Regions:
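Short hydrophobic/aromatic beta-strand micro-patches
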Residues: 58-60
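Catalytic core of pol beta-like nucleotidyltransferases
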Residues: 1-32, 38, 44-51, 63-328
């Protein structure tokens, strides 16, 4: 794919806080454990971040249990390492909080933890769901790689995932389309594949914050597809040489239905894996929706049993889009 390495390694703004967090991860886990660290999300693309926004990392470690043991030894986790490792294998990735300097007005990272094989599977054509693929085909930055082989490895995975966009976004495209239209549709489809406590027009914020990158990246993807004979140019727009079949459409819809179920299961798992998850998500709901959520002592003790009414209320009160093109 044209320009793939630049999309991971080039023109990343210096962020001292992110660098401190990455170095802390390496110090805690050990250089031999940390293969790569990727940054994505609002802190990278500047999609409505504020000083409370966590850094979104994808951390690739060589062994789950060794990593979680290291967090406990450093006093950065109170979770059982054995349980964390089991959950990570059952439904990757785990999402953990990493707050080496505390929680008050200092940098905090929200870390997706994967072993190498799990990341490779999550970004492949045979991914069990869209959770990681939908995020990492967007703009990402490679903050750390153990060596040159690690750079080549992760760059290849992300490049292959981007080259696969037309397979799962294609069934939702019109008869003809531009790179920018594919980029927006890709984000809309990805966001619909999850349960998110945000207004529908959040997808437009994400699109606009990284439109130059997405348009350039999709220009490369579509040009490669045209070279391969999958697309043709017609009046400045692209068209499929052979439109996605009904079978392909149903296969993709089934994939996203399964992905949404697995995403919902991850929300339940986050309560176990993520320190202060309930406070974090309550703040996120307030920041994105303007709805204050108070969590009682008993709801903290029995979240799976007692929090459902508030979850339903938040989803029901989620504001509809007020902007054209952002689906609910």
């Amino acid at each position: 794919m044209r320009g793939s390495t630049e999309s991971l390694c080039g023109t990343v703004p210096t962020d001292a806080a992110a660098e401190r967090l990455v170095q802390s991860l390496i110090d805690v886990a050990g250089e031999d454990q940390v293969r790569t660290v990727l940054l994505f999300g609002s802190r990278l693309v500047q999609a409505s971040p504020d000083r409370f926004s966590a850094y979104d990392f994808v951390l690739v470690v060589e062994n789950y249990r060794a990593f979680y043991d290291a967090l406990v030894r450093a006093g950065l986790s109170r979770r059982l390492p054995a349980l964390q490792a089991v959950l990570n294998r059952l439904l990757a990735p785990n999402v953990v909080a990493f707050a080496p300097e505390g929680w008050n007005d200092v940098p905090v990272a929200k870390v997706m933890v994967l072993e190498p094989a799990a990341l490779a599977r999550a970004l492949s054509r045979h991914a069990p769901d869209h959770f990681l693929k939908g995020r990492l085909v967007q703009r990402v930055a490679l903050l750390h790689a153990r060596d040159g082989a690690a750079v080549d490895w992760v760059t290849g995975l992300v490049t292959d995932a981007r080259n696969d966009i037309l397979r799962w976004a294609g069934p939702f495209l019109g008869e003809s389309f531009t790179p920018a239209e594919v980029a927006l549709r890709m984000l809309q489809v990805s966001y619909r594949g999850e349960v998110r406590p945000e207004a529908g027009d959040r997808v437009l914020d994400v699109f606009e914050s990284q439109q130059p990158f997405l348009s350039d990246m999709l220009t490369c993807v579509l040009a490669d597809a045209a070279d391969a004979g999958e697309l043709r140019l017609a009046g400045g727009n692209y068209q499929f040489v052979r439109a996605p079949s009904s079978r392909q459409r149903w296969s993709v819809r089934l994939y996203f239905a399964r992905s949404k179920l697995r995403a919902t299961a991850r929300w339940l798992k986050h309560v176990v894996t993520f320190e202060n998850w309930l406070d974090y998500i309550a703040y996120k709901v307030e920041r994105r929706m303007g709805t204050r959520v108070e969590i009682t002592t008993w709801e903290r003790r029995l979240p799976y049993l007692l929090l459902w009414p508030k979850v339903v209320r938040v989803l029901r009160e989620r504001p509809a889009s007020s902007r054209t093109g952002a689906p609910r």
